[in-house]
């Protein structure tokens, strides 16, 4: 199975731009890979929320929204599975979720982040987390997703360790300075990933509308046995295809 880690650019609050970026990559990689993986909250952008539910309920979308349907149609048309982060609205709650669509355009997994680090501490019950990890099948592989901070909790490592899968997908939004990631932080992530005792595919997005030194600047890697088996560095947009 070929998995392409898309460490590419997004714009906060520009869901149309981000949707078109996903669909453009689906078209570009038709016949070249089996799964395209994008980072956490890629569809709306990580910093798109105000933490006022009356405002944010119009930014978050349900998995049945037309924007999701458009991406499903592209996946079906180009026979390519895709997984991307989005800010999900379900009933009266908002989640940081990762949606995976197979190459027939069918949603096969909608994972809700279980750790609270995606939101500020002062939020009310409208901002929520999921409660468990799920195993799903794509092609001939069984897959588990953990979003960003999920994999830094011992309890979550234990939960995943009790589940059987071929690999773990680790979409994130991290805002390390790109030099810090390239020189030090990636090794800490490789070590943490080794606790899962299976290949872990990491991808971070690239923020196009914020120019601070400590902001998401891409980067993607295959971690296995505490090692970085393959990678593209942080600091510029890029994609890397991993064969599992």
Model-derived features: where do they sit?
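Active-site-proximal beta-strand elements of phosphoester/diester hydrolases
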Residues: 1-14, 97, 141-150, 169
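Cys-nucleophile CN-hydrolase/nitrilase-fold catalytic domain and related Cys-dependent amidase chemistry
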Residues: 24-103, 175-198
């Amino acid at each position: 199975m070929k998995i392409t880690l898309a460490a590419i650019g997004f714009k906060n609050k520009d869901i149309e731009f981000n949707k078109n970026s996903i669909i453009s990559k689906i078209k570009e990689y038709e016949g070249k890979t089996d799964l395209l993986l994008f980072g956490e909250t890629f569809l709306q952008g990580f910093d798109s929320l105000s933490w006022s539910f009356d405002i944010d309920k119009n930014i978050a979308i349900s998995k049945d929204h037309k924007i999701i349907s458009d991406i499903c149609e592209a996946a079906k048309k180009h026979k390519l599975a895709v997984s991307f982060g989005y800010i999900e609205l379900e009933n009266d709650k908002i989640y940081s979720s990762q949606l995976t669509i197979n190459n027939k355009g069918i949603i096969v997994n909608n994972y809700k982040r279980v750790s609270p680090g995606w939101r500020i501490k002062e939020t009310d019950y409208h901002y929520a987390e999921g409660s468990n990890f799920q195993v799903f099948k794509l092609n001939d592989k069984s897959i588990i997703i953990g979003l960003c901070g999920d994999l830094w909790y011992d309890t979550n490592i234990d939960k995943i360790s009790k589940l059987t899968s071929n690999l773990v997908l680790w979409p994130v939004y991290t805002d390390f300075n790109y030099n810090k990631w390239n020189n030090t932080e990636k090794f800490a992530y490789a070590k943490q990933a080794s606790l899962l005792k299976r290949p872990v595919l990491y991808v971070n997005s690239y923020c196009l509308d914020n120019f601070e030194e400590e902001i998401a600047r891409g980067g993607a890697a295959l971690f296995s046995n505490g090692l970085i088996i393959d990678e593209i560095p942080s600091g510029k947009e890029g994609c890397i295809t991993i064969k599992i």
